Protein backbone atom coordinates (compact mmCIF):
# COMPACT_ATOMS: atom_id res chain seq x y z
CA UNK A 1 0.00 0.00 0.00
CA UNK A 2 1.31 3.45 -0.92
CA UNK A 3 3.13 5.54 1.66
CA UNK A 4 1.04 8.55 0.61
CA UNK A 5 -2.16 7.03 1.97
CA UNK A 6 -2.85 8.98 5.15
CA UNK A 7 -5.75 11.16 6.35
CA UNK A 8 -5.71 14.87 5.58
CA UNK A 9 -5.14 17.01 8.68
CA UNK A 10 -8.26 19.01 9.55
CA UNK A 11 -8.86 21.95 11.87
CA UNK A 12 -11.73 20.03 13.47
CA UNK A 13 -10.97 16.30 13.62
CA UNK A 14 -14.02 14.01 14.04
CA UNK A 15 -11.78 11.17 15.22
CA UNK A 16 -8.14 10.53 16.11
CA UNK A 17 -5.51 10.09 13.41
CA UNK A 18 -4.91 6.37 14.05
CA UNK A 19 -8.59 5.45 13.77
CA UNK A 20 -9.04 7.55 10.62
CA UNK A 21 -5.89 5.95 9.19
CA UNK A 22 -7.22 2.41 9.72
CA UNK A 23 -10.59 3.25 8.15
CA UNK A 24 -8.85 4.90 5.19
CA UNK A 25 -6.88 1.68 4.54
CA UNK A 26 -10.16 -0.27 4.50
CA UNK A 27 -11.66 2.20 2.03
CA UNK A 28 -8.65 1.86 -0.25
CA UNK A 29 -9.07 -1.94 -0.31
CA UNK A 30 -12.77 -1.58 -1.10
CA UNK A 31 -11.96 0.75 -3.99
CA UNK A 32 -9.41 -1.75 -5.32
CA UNK A 33 -12.19 -4.35 -5.48
CA UNK A 34 -14.74 -1.94 -6.95
CA UNK A 35 -12.40 -0.71 -9.70
CA UNK A 36 -10.64 -4.03 -10.40
CA UNK A 37 -12.04 -3.95 -13.95
CA UNK A 38 -10.45 -0.58 -14.79
CA UNK A 39 -6.92 0.40 -15.72
CA UNK A 40 -6.59 2.74 -12.77
CA UNK A 41 -3.37 2.61 -10.76
CA UNK A 42 -3.04 2.29 -7.00
CA UNK A 43 -1.97 5.94 -6.92
CA UNK A 44 -5.27 6.94 -8.57
CA UNK A 45 -7.18 4.90 -6.00
CA UNK A 46 -5.15 6.30 -3.10
CA UNK A 47 -6.05 9.81 -4.21
CA UNK A 48 -9.71 8.90 -4.53
CA UNK A 49 -9.75 7.17 -1.13
CA UNK A 50 -8.17 10.24 0.47
CA UNK A 51 -10.72 12.59 -1.12
CA UNK A 52 -13.67 10.45 -0.09
CA UNK A 53 -12.47 10.00 3.49
CA UNK A 54 -11.81 13.71 4.04
CA UNK A 55 -15.22 14.54 2.54
CA UNK A 56 -16.90 12.28 5.09
CA UNK A 57 -14.69 13.61 7.92
CA UNK A 58 -15.64 17.21 7.13
CA UNK A 59 -19.33 16.36 7.04
CA UNK A 60 -19.44 14.34 10.27
CA UNK A 61 -20.26 16.19 13.49
CA UNK A 62 -18.82 13.57 15.84
CA UNK A 63 -16.67 10.47 15.95
CA UNK A 64 -19.78 8.31 16.10
CA UNK A 65 -21.36 9.90 13.01
CA UNK A 66 -18.01 9.63 11.19
CA UNK A 67 -17.82 5.88 11.86
CA UNK A 68 -21.43 5.41 10.76
CA UNK A 69 -20.98 7.44 7.56
CA UNK A 70 -17.78 5.60 6.69
CA UNK A 71 -19.50 2.23 7.22
CA UNK A 72 -22.15 3.32 4.70
CA UNK A 73 -19.45 4.36 2.24
CA UNK A 74 -17.49 1.11 2.68
CA UNK A 75 -20.64 -0.90 2.03
CA UNK A 76 -21.99 1.10 -0.91
CA UNK A 77 -18.71 1.40 -2.81
CA UNK A 78 -18.99 -2.34 -3.53
CA UNK A 79 -22.78 -2.39 -3.67
CA UNK A 80 -22.84 0.14 -6.51
CA UNK A 81 -19.62 -1.12 -8.12
CA UNK A 82 -17.78 2.16 -7.68
CA UNK A 83 -20.57 4.40 -9.01
CA UNK A 84 -20.23 7.19 -6.45
CA UNK A 85 -23.19 9.12 -7.85
CA UNK A 86 -25.50 6.54 -6.27
CA UNK A 87 -24.00 6.81 -2.78
CA UNK A 88 -25.58 9.09 -0.18
CA UNK A 89 -23.97 10.31 3.05
CA UNK A 90 -26.28 11.92 5.62
CA UNK A 91 -29.06 11.57 3.05
CA UNK A 92 -27.19 13.66 0.49
CA UNK A 93 -25.45 12.54 -2.71
CA UNK A 94 -21.73 12.08 -2.31
CA UNK A 95 -20.41 15.38 -3.68
CA UNK A 96 -16.85 16.37 -4.45
CA UNK A 97 -15.69 12.97 -5.71
CA UNK A 98 -17.28 12.54 -9.10
CA UNK A 99 -15.21 15.19 -10.97
CA UNK A 100 -12.02 13.34 -10.08
CA UNK A 101 -13.12 9.93 -11.38
CA UNK A 102 -11.94 10.70 -14.91
CA UNK A 103 -8.41 9.86 -13.84
CA UNK A 104 -9.34 6.23 -13.12
CA UNK A 105 -8.96 4.01 -16.14
CA UNK A 106 -9.63 6.77 -18.68
CA UNK A 107 -7.42 8.74 -21.02
CA UNK A 108 -7.22 12.50 -20.60
CA UNK A 109 -10.10 14.19 -22.37
CA UNK A 110 -8.15 17.43 -22.88
CA UNK A 111 -5.18 17.06 -25.21
CA UNK A 112 -5.06 20.44 -26.97
CA UNK A 113 -4.15 23.88 -25.67
CA UNK A 114 -7.35 25.34 -27.08
CA UNK A 115 -9.50 22.88 -25.11
CA UNK A 116 -7.43 23.52 -21.99
CA UNK A 117 -7.82 27.28 -22.40
CA UNK A 118 -11.56 26.83 -22.75
CA UNK A 119 -11.71 24.88 -19.49
CA UNK A 120 -9.43 27.33 -17.69
CA UNK A 121 -11.41 30.39 -18.74
CA UNK A 122 -14.49 28.80 -17.18
CA UNK A 123 -12.68 28.87 -13.82
CA UNK A 124 -11.79 32.59 -13.92
CA UNK A 125 -13.35 34.35 -10.94
CA UNK A 126 -15.77 37.25 -11.20
CA UNK A 127 -14.49 40.65 -10.02
CA UNK A 128 -17.12 40.76 -7.25
CA UNK A 129 -15.89 37.41 -5.94
CA UNK A 130 -12.32 38.70 -6.02
CA UNK A 131 -13.18 41.84 -4.06
CA UNK A 132 -15.19 39.80 -1.54
CA UNK A 133 -12.12 37.62 -0.94
CA UNK A 134 -9.71 40.46 -0.22
CA UNK A 135 -8.36 41.26 -3.68
CA UNK A 136 -7.38 44.84 -4.38
CA UNK A 137 -9.31 45.66 -7.56
CA UNK A 138 -8.69 48.60 -9.87
CA UNK A 139 -11.94 50.35 -8.93
CA UNK A 140 -10.58 50.92 -5.41
CA UNK A 141 -8.38 53.72 -6.75
CA UNK A 142 -11.45 55.95 -6.90
CA UNK A 143 -12.72 55.28 -3.37
CA UNK A 144 -9.66 55.53 -1.18
CA UNK A 145 -9.85 56.14 2.54
CA UNK A 146 -6.72 57.21 4.36
CA UNK A 147 -8.05 56.68 7.89
CA UNK A 148 -6.17 53.41 8.48
CA UNK A 149 -3.00 54.30 6.62
CA UNK A 150 -2.44 57.49 8.64
CA UNK A 151 -2.73 55.78 12.02
CA UNK A 152 0.47 56.08 14.05
CA UNK A 153 -0.15 52.86 15.95
CA UNK A 154 -0.81 49.30 14.81
CA UNK A 155 -1.47 46.00 16.60
CA UNK A 156 1.43 43.57 16.38
CA UNK A 157 0.42 40.77 14.01
CA UNK A 158 1.99 38.24 16.38
CA UNK A 159 1.28 39.26 19.97
CA UNK A 160 -1.49 41.86 19.35
CA UNK A 161 0.30 44.58 21.38
CA UNK A 162 -0.24 48.09 20.07
CA UNK A 163 2.97 49.80 19.04
CA UNK A 164 4.06 52.92 17.19
CA UNK A 165 4.83 52.12 13.54
CA UNK A 166 7.77 54.51 13.44
CA UNK A 167 9.34 52.61 16.37
CA UNK A 168 9.31 49.27 14.57
CA UNK A 169 13.12 49.05 14.32
CA UNK A 170 13.53 49.64 18.06
CA UNK A 171 14.07 46.48 20.10
CA UNK A 172 11.34 45.22 22.40
CA UNK A 173 10.01 41.84 23.51
CA UNK A 174 7.33 40.12 21.44
CA UNK A 175 6.09 36.77 22.76
CA UNK A 176 3.85 34.75 20.44
CA UNK A 177 2.87 31.36 19.00
CA UNK A 178 4.21 30.84 15.45
CA UNK A 179 1.37 28.45 14.48
CA UNK A 180 -2.36 29.18 14.54
CA UNK A 181 -4.39 27.55 17.26
CA UNK A 182 -6.59 24.56 16.39
CA UNK A 183 -9.92 23.71 17.98
CA UNK A 184 -10.12 20.28 19.64
CA UNK A 185 -13.64 18.85 19.59
CA UNK A 186 -12.92 16.37 22.38
CA UNK A 187 -11.49 18.83 24.93
CA UNK A 188 -13.64 21.77 23.70
CA UNK A 189 -10.67 24.17 23.70
CA UNK A 190 -8.01 25.48 21.35
CA UNK A 191 -4.51 24.07 21.16
CA UNK A 192 -1.33 25.53 19.68
CA UNK A 193 0.32 22.85 17.50
CA UNK A 194 3.70 24.60 17.81
CA UNK A 195 4.06 23.74 21.51
CA UNK A 196 0.96 21.84 22.62
CA UNK A 197 -0.24 24.60 24.96
CA UNK A 198 -3.97 25.23 25.24
CA UNK A 199 -5.92 28.46 25.62
CA UNK A 200 -7.13 27.46 29.09
CA UNK A 201 -3.63 26.61 30.33
CA UNK A 202 -2.22 28.45 33.35
CA UNK A 203 1.34 27.96 32.11
CA UNK A 204 3.39 31.02 31.17
CA UNK A 205 3.87 29.40 27.75
CA UNK A 206 0.21 30.02 26.91
CA UNK A 207 1.26 33.60 26.11
CA UNK A 208 3.67 32.34 23.49
CA UNK A 209 6.37 29.73 22.98
CA UNK A 210 8.60 31.94 20.83
CA UNK A 211 10.07 35.41 21.31
CA UNK A 212 11.31 38.07 18.93
CA UNK A 213 12.88 41.47 19.55
CA UNK A 214 10.57 43.48 17.30
CA UNK A 215 6.84 43.84 16.77
CA UNK A 216 5.55 43.46 13.20
CA UNK A 217 2.53 44.70 11.26
CA UNK A 218 0.86 44.11 7.92
CA UNK A 219 -1.09 46.74 6.03
CA UNK A 220 -3.96 45.28 3.98
CA UNK A 221 -6.01 48.19 2.65
CA UNK A 222 -5.28 49.80 -0.71
CA UNK A 223 -4.13 53.01 0.97
CA UNK A 224 -1.80 51.21 3.36
CA UNK A 225 -0.24 49.14 0.58
CA UNK A 226 0.28 52.24 -1.56
CA UNK A 227 2.42 53.72 1.24
CA UNK A 228 5.06 51.15 0.24
CA UNK A 229 4.67 51.39 -3.54
CA UNK A 230 1.94 52.20 -6.03
CA UNK A 231 -0.06 49.55 -7.88
CA UNK A 232 0.46 48.74 -11.55
CA UNK A 233 -2.31 47.50 -13.84
CA UNK A 234 -1.77 44.65 -16.27
CA UNK A 235 -4.32 46.41 -18.52
CA UNK A 236 -1.46 48.67 -19.59
CA UNK A 237 0.70 45.76 -20.80
CA UNK A 238 -0.27 43.94 -24.01
CA UNK A 239 1.36 40.59 -24.69
CA UNK A 240 1.06 36.89 -25.37
CA UNK A 241 -1.90 34.90 -24.08
CA UNK A 242 -0.45 32.61 -21.43
CA UNK A 243 -1.35 30.76 -18.25
CA UNK A 244 0.99 31.26 -15.32
CA UNK A 245 1.03 29.76 -11.84
CA UNK A 246 2.78 31.91 -9.25
CA UNK A 247 3.64 32.07 -5.60
CA UNK A 248 5.38 34.66 -3.41
CA UNK A 249 7.26 34.45 -0.16
CA UNK A 250 6.96 37.46 2.13
CA UNK A 251 8.84 39.08 5.02
CA UNK A 252 8.23 41.77 7.61
CA UNK A 253 9.98 45.09 7.02
CA UNK A 254 9.97 48.58 8.46
CA UNK A 255 7.16 49.38 5.99
CA UNK A 256 5.00 46.34 6.75
CA UNK A 257 4.78 43.12 4.74
CA UNK A 258 6.73 42.78 1.49
CA UNK A 259 7.57 40.28 -1.25
CA UNK A 260 11.03 38.70 -0.98
CA UNK A 261 10.75 35.86 -3.49
CA UNK A 262 8.62 35.27 -6.58
CA UNK A 263 8.26 32.11 -8.66
CA UNK A 264 6.32 31.97 -11.94
CA UNK A 265 5.69 28.63 -13.71
CA UNK A 266 4.21 28.07 -17.18
CA UNK A 267 1.03 25.97 -17.10
CA UNK A 268 1.53 24.21 -20.43
CA UNK A 269 5.24 23.37 -20.23
CA UNK A 270 5.77 23.19 -16.47
CA UNK A 271 8.91 25.28 -16.91
CA UNK A 272 9.92 27.88 -14.34
CA UNK A 273 10.00 31.26 -16.10
CA UNK A 274 10.95 33.46 -13.15
CA UNK A 275 12.35 32.55 -9.74
CA UNK A 276 14.26 35.22 -7.81
CA UNK A 277 14.85 36.43 -4.29
CA UNK A 278 13.87 40.11 -4.35
CA UNK A 279 15.03 43.02 -2.22
CA UNK A 280 12.19 44.58 -0.22
CA UNK A 281 11.82 48.36 -0.23
CA UNK A 282 11.85 48.73 3.56
CA UNK A 283 14.51 47.67 6.07
CA UNK A 284 14.26 43.98 6.98
CA UNK A 285 12.72 43.27 10.39
CA UNK A 286 12.20 39.51 10.03
CA UNK A 287 12.67 37.32 6.95
CA UNK A 288 10.20 34.87 8.48
CA UNK A 289 12.61 32.12 7.39
CA UNK A 290 10.71 29.30 9.10
CA UNK A 291 7.92 29.91 6.61
CA UNK A 292 9.47 31.82 3.70
CA UNK A 293 12.53 29.60 3.33
CA UNK A 294 14.59 32.74 2.62
CA UNK A 295 17.52 33.13 5.02
CA UNK A 296 19.36 36.10 3.54
CA UNK A 297 18.99 38.77 0.89
CA UNK A 298 22.03 40.03 -0.96
CA UNK A 299 21.43 43.77 -1.32
CA UNK A 300 24.15 43.87 -3.98
CA UNK A 301 23.07 41.10 -6.35
CA UNK A 302 19.36 40.46 -5.74
CA UNK A 303 17.01 42.52 -7.94
CA UNK A 304 15.10 45.37 -6.32
CA UNK A 305 11.31 45.39 -6.41
CA UNK A 306 11.38 47.88 -9.32
CA UNK A 307 13.90 45.78 -11.27
CA UNK A 308 11.83 42.63 -10.72
CA UNK A 309 8.61 44.46 -11.70
CA UNK A 310 10.14 45.49 -15.02
CA UNK A 311 10.80 41.81 -15.77
CA UNK A 312 7.66 40.02 -14.56
CA UNK A 313 5.23 42.71 -15.74
CA UNK A 314 5.98 42.39 -19.45
CA UNK A 315 4.57 41.12 -22.75
CA UNK A 316 6.15 37.67 -22.33
CA UNK A 317 5.26 37.13 -18.68
CA UNK A 318 2.40 38.80 -16.78
CA UNK A 319 0.28 40.99 -19.06
CA UNK A 320 -3.39 41.78 -19.66
CA UNK A 321 -3.92 38.51 -21.56
CA UNK A 322 -2.46 36.29 -18.82
CA UNK A 323 -4.50 33.89 -16.72
CA UNK A 324 -2.89 33.78 -13.28
CA UNK A 325 -3.20 30.74 -11.01
CA UNK A 326 -2.49 30.79 -7.29
CA UNK A 327 -3.68 29.75 -3.84
CA UNK A 328 -4.86 32.74 -1.82
CA UNK A 329 -3.56 34.78 -4.75
CA UNK A 330 -4.81 38.05 -3.25
CA UNK A 331 -1.83 37.93 -0.89
CA UNK A 332 0.60 37.54 -3.78
CA UNK A 333 -0.93 40.20 -6.03
CA UNK A 334 -1.11 42.62 -3.10
CA UNK A 335 2.62 42.38 -2.36
CA UNK A 336 3.38 42.43 -6.10
CA UNK A 337 1.20 45.59 -6.27
CA UNK A 338 -0.75 44.37 -9.30
CA UNK A 339 -4.29 44.92 -10.55
CA UNK A 340 -5.31 41.86 -12.58
CA UNK A 341 -8.75 40.45 -13.39
CA UNK A 342 -8.08 37.02 -14.93
CA UNK A 343 -7.53 34.94 -11.82
CA UNK A 344 -7.99 31.29 -10.84
CA UNK A 345 -7.67 30.90 -7.07
CA UNK A 346 -7.68 27.34 -5.73
CA UNK A 347 -8.37 28.60 -2.19
CA UNK A 348 -11.71 29.95 -3.46
CA UNK A 349 -12.43 27.11 -5.90
CA UNK A 350 -12.09 24.50 -3.17
CA UNK A 351 -13.59 26.44 -0.26
CA UNK A 352 -16.47 24.48 1.25
CA UNK A 353 -17.34 26.67 4.22
CA UNK A 354 -16.25 30.09 5.44
CA UNK A 355 -12.88 28.44 6.12
CA UNK A 356 -10.52 27.93 3.20
CA UNK A 357 -8.49 24.75 2.89
CA UNK A 358 -4.72 25.20 3.13
CA UNK A 359 -2.56 24.48 0.08
CA UNK A 360 -0.75 21.83 2.11
CA UNK A 361 -3.96 19.90 2.73
CA UNK A 362 -5.32 20.56 -0.77
CA UNK A 363 -2.15 19.21 -2.41
CA UNK A 364 -2.38 16.07 -0.31
CA UNK A 365 -6.12 15.65 -0.84
CA UNK A 366 -6.07 16.18 -4.62
CA UNK A 367 -2.53 15.15 -5.61
CA UNK A 368 -1.49 12.84 -2.74
CA UNK A 369 1.55 15.10 -2.58
CA UNK A 370 3.25 16.24 0.61
CA UNK A 371 4.42 19.86 0.59
CA UNK A 372 5.42 22.45 3.21
CA UNK A 373 6.78 19.83 5.59
CA UNK A 374 9.36 22.36 6.72
CA UNK A 375 10.08 25.77 5.27
CA UNK A 376 7.85 26.93 2.42
CA UNK A 377 9.19 26.95 -1.13
CA UNK A 378 7.47 29.26 -3.62
CA UNK A 379 8.54 27.01 -6.51
CA UNK A 380 7.03 23.91 -4.91
CA UNK A 381 3.85 25.80 -4.00
CA UNK A 382 3.39 27.31 -7.49
CA UNK A 383 3.75 23.88 -9.11
CA UNK A 384 1.37 22.24 -6.61
CA UNK A 385 -1.29 24.90 -7.24
CA UNK A 386 -0.91 24.48 -11.00
CA UNK A 387 -1.28 20.70 -10.72
CA UNK A 388 -4.40 21.03 -8.55
CA UNK A 389 -6.00 23.08 -11.34
CA UNK A 390 -4.92 20.52 -13.95
CA UNK A 391 -6.67 17.76 -12.01
CA UNK A 392 -9.70 20.03 -11.59
CA UNK A 393 -10.19 20.20 -15.38
CA UNK A 394 -9.22 16.58 -16.04
CA UNK A 395 -5.58 16.94 -17.07
CA UNK A 396 -2.76 14.81 -15.69
CA UNK A 397 -0.27 16.87 -13.63
CA UNK A 398 2.56 15.36 -15.71
CA UNK A 399 1.11 16.46 -19.06
CA UNK A 400 3.38 18.98 -20.81
CA UNK A 401 2.93 18.00 -24.47
CA UNK A 402 -0.09 19.14 -26.43
CA UNK A 403 -1.68 18.33 -29.76
CA UNK A 404 -2.19 21.15 -32.23
Swiss-Prot record:
The lineage of its organism: Eukaryota, Fungi, Dikarya, Ascomycota, Saccharomycotina. Its main location: cytoplasm. GO terms for biological process: exonucleolytic trimming to generate mature 3'-end of 5.8S rRNA from tricistronic rRNA transcript (SSU-rRNA, 5.8S rRNA, LSU-rRNA); regulatory ncRNA 3'-end processing; rRNA 3'-end processing; U5 snRNA 3'-end processing. Keywords: Cytoplasm, Exonuclease, Hydrolase, Nuclease, Nucleus, rRNA processing. 3' to 5' exoribonuclease required for proper 3' end maturation of MRP RNA and of the U5L snRNA. GO terms for molecular function: 3'-5' exonuclease activity; 3'-5'-RNA exonuclease activity; exonuclease activity; nucleic acid binding. GO terms for cellular component: cytoplasm; nucleus. It is found in: Cytoplasm; Nucleus. PANTHER family: RNA EXONUCLEASE 3, RNA EXONUCLEASE REXO1 / RECO3 FAMILY MEMBER-RELATED. The keyword rRNA processing applies. This is RNA exonuclease 3. It comes from the Eukaryota. Belongs to the REXO1/REXO3 family. Residues 243-389 form the Exonuclease domain.
